[in-house]
């Protein structure tokens, strides 16, 4: 059985994938001990909302107090880069293949969805974290909340 080769993902498409992954991942408290995504997604959303005003404030404040332009711009660029780092990490995580322990769990969740009568598309190649996020989102919508207890 040959798996299709995945081409490397471009640097800029990782940001779009990270945004999609953040929207897809179910933010359930029961997933937090196993997956770090809950914390990263919350921190990234917070940074997207807070860092642009902080960058503008620090830029204006340093210039108004007679500071030099170079450090002011560097501080503003650093503040603006924080949400981008979160999106980049999420994008990189979304295309990472699942490790064997989580892969077994992924197939168990898919099996529970199929037992419940849900039609699922076949998995192509090795599943990644985006496929896990899609499956978990669907499981949280269509299965009862106790499906995680059995796994």
Curated annotation (Swiss-Prot):
Q: What's a GO cellular component annotated to this UniProt protein?
A: plasma membrane
Answer whether the UniProt record assigns the keyword Lyase to this protein. Answer: no
What subcellular compartments does it reside in?
Cell inner membrane
Q: What is its main location?
A: membrane
Task: Give the superkingdom in one word.
Answer: Bacteria
Q: What Pfam families is this protein classified in? A: DUF412
Name the UniProt key words of this record, in alphabetical order: Cell inner membrane, Cell membrane, Membrane, Transmembrane, Transmembrane helix
Q: Give the protein family.
A: Belongs to the UPF0208 family.
Q: What is this protein called?
A: UPF0208 membrane protein KPN78578_26420
Q: What is the lineage of its organism?
A: Bacteria, Pseudomonadati, Pseudomonadota, Gammaproteobacteria, Enterobacterales
């Amino acid at each position: 059985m040959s798996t299709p080769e995945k081409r490397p993902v471009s640097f800029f498409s990782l940001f779009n994938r990270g945004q999609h992954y953040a929207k897809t991942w179910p933010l359930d408290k029961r997933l937090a001990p196993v997956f770090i995504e809950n914390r990263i997604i919350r921190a990234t959303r917070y940074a997207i909302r807070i860092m642009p005003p902080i960058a503008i404030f620090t830029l204006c404040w340093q210039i108004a107090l007679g500071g030099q332009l170079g450090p002011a711009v560097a501080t503003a660029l650093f503040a603006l880069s924080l949400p981008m780092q979160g999106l980049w990490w999420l994008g990189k995580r979304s295309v990472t293949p699942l490790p064997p322990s989580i892969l077994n769990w992924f197939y168990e969740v898919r099996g529970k969805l199929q037992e419940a009568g849900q039609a699922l598309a076949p998995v192509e190649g090795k599943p990644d974290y985006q496929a896990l996020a899609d499956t978990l989102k669907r499981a949280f919508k269509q299965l009862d909340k106790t499906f995680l207890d059995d796994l």
